[in-house]
Amino acid sequence: MEPFALTRLREQRLVAVIRAPDAAAALGAARAVAAGGVRIVEITFTVPDALQVMAELRNEPGLTVGAGTVLTAAQARAALAAGARFLIAPNLSREVADEAAGAGVLFCPGAYTTTEILAARAAGAHVVKIYPVGVAGGPAYIRIIRDPLPDIPMLAAGGTTLENVVPFLEAGCVGVGLGASLADPALAAAGRFDELTRRARAFVERLEAADLRAAGA
């Protein structure tokens, strides 16, 4: 059986990457994007008191909460104890992979080249985060690397925008991680949560329109 968060990712396709200067801003940002329809949220360990944020969000209806920038086994264990349903990292750590496997949660390490992608998959990655995908070449890069690796689920991150979110999915990504283009830390710090909700709705509506086109509506 696949991890719960992977099923949710296949359904929802969007992950809000929450970075903020303090826990209150992170909580507000997570709730704001969820109100706009983006209901998978990654609380990065760069957020002060990130574990507190995860713990406060873990039981909110319809929200799937996970940890980002998970660099060590200790961070992985702490995130899992706080209720994280997935672990995402910019790199591959076999210790973090082992913690995810032991808990049965989604593990999504970062990779850039085909060699790194295959190493991540061999270590137990359910999904591989292609990062930073904007520098690598965007959707065109995804199409190229999926030719030899069509069976490895990929998450685009680092350089994703409203304009390229659908092209990334059309190129074969199972999902897209959205950082500043959605949950801008400056907006969160300023308390402009209505703008974050508006951005989330725009991303969701962009996907809905693409789905209708694909269905021939």
Identify the residue ranges that each predicted region occupies.
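Distinct, well-ordered alpha-helical segments
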Residues: 26, 54-58, 121, 142, ...
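Conserved N-terminal beta1-alpha1 strand-loop-helix module at the mouth
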Residues: 1-85, 102, 151, 162-163, ...
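Glycine-rich beta-to-alpha transition loops that act as phosphate-gripper elements at the mouths
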Residues: 19-22, 47, 67-73, 89-93, ...
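Catalytic cores of alpha/beta
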Residues: 29, 72-82, 115-123, 137, ...
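Glycine-rich phosphate-binding active-site loops on the catalytic face of alpha/beta enzymes
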Residues: 86, 90-99, 129-138, 172-194
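Conserved functional loop/turn residues at catalytic and ligand-binding sites
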Residues: 37, 61, 83, 91, ...
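Glycine/Thr-rich beta-alpha phosphate-binding loop at enzyme active sites
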Residues: 39-43, 80-82, 102-103, 113-142, ...
